[in-house]
């Protein structure tokens, strides 16, 4: 597994498109979420994702600085492609680590 952490301006168009496809498949199609999937918060986020050994997306999370969607740093859009194998836990652990180390977060809101 490879962990990738990129800010919006570091993502290629292909990477961002792939992340949006995954998010839409899970949150809009599968979970029928009524919330807008593409928003301006993406531009402020650190996008974290795991790729498996074949290069496919295995997990994703979006980490936001304080003041973007909440008064505190926040973690949202969490996806584990394969469920029941610990990827959700791994991506959350990494998201918390990034929020603490990169954003100096003492308090983190989970969306």
Per-region residue spans from a language model:
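Residue-level signal for beta-strand positions within conserved beta-sheet cores that form or flank
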Residues: 1, 71, 106
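Short amphipathic alpha-helix that is part of the acyltransferase structural core
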Residues: 1-35, 39-44, 51-56
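Conserved, charge-rich beta-strand/loop surface module that forms ligand/interface-binding patches
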Residues: 30, 66-68
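Conserved beta-strand in the GNAT
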Residues: 49, 56-65, 72-79
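Conserved acetyl-CoA-binding loop-helix of GNAT-fold acetyltransferases
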Residues: 80, 85-98
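Conserved GNAT acetyl-CoA-binding A-motif
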Residues: 99-111
């Amino acid at each position: 597994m490879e962990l990738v952490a990129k800010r919006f301006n570091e993502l290629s168009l292909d990477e961002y498109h792939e992340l949006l496809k995954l998010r839409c498949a899970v949150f809009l199609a599968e979970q029928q979420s009524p919330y807008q999937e593409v928003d301006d918060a993406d531009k402020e986020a650190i996008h974290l994702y795991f790729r498996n050994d074949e290069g496919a997306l295995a997990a994703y999370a979006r980490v936001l600085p304080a003041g973007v969607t909440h008064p505190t740093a926040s973690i949202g859009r969490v996806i584990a492609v394969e469920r029941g194998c610990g990827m959700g836990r791994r991506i959350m652990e990494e998201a918390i680590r990034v929020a603490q180390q990169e954003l100096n977060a003492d308090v983190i809101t989970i969306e």
